Amino acid sequence: VSYSFNSDLANGSESRSGNGSISELYLGGAWSPVKGLSVGANFSYMFGTLEHSTAIVGTSTSVFYRMMEVRDWNVHIGAQYAIDINRKNRVVLGATYTPKKTFRGNTIGTFYDAANDTKIDTAFQCNMKGNYEQPNTYGVGISYNHGTKLFAEVDFTYQDWANAKYTPMTGFEPVKVKFDNRWKVSGGLQFIPDDRGNYLKRINYRLGAFYNHDYLNVLGNNVRDYGVTCGFGFPALGSKSLVNLGFEWKHRVSSPTCL
């Protein structure tokens, strides 16, 4: 989570920001029942903290702060099927699914009124189980290989956040907190001129792009971001390792109002 928005009010302004992440430790396995087909699953333990704050500045200043501590398990399942067109050309189709589930952990809300020099007070606290949910997540992708020279891939991910349960904090948020369904499409390719040629021809050249419709809905505005990436994989002298260098340009916008 990483965002920051500002909007004008009749007698002041409102700013919202958030940061944090949820990490996962994985244990996975896979099985190939028939040639070309692979199925597998990852079981993981999730842990991390998400922080959100809202500051209202006017004749007085009030700060609302929410922290969510997640400690939970998760499961991801997937399958892929490889089609060998000939000796050099291969197409791989893949799909993934992460089921909807309730989060386990705790959430705490605090409030501070600068005008009255109010002490920071815990105004809301609850167990996340049964109050906050992770949505269903679906993913599909297709990739193409031409020997070791060319690799290209396109992926699509969809999460139905609009149907995920989210219990608002009393006094902190509207009775109904709205999320948008999230979807993202991304693609990339890697090109190696000649993996047996001179040094410049053995460099990995990479290019990609993405478009993301986020689940955030801020004051009725949809949030989305898009960007391009490029990178290089430089062969390390005397070994088969690569030294990777990458760049990314990203732009985040909201509509219909620019925040």
Model-found features: residue ranges?
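Outer-membrane beta-barrel porins/channels
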Residues: 1-259
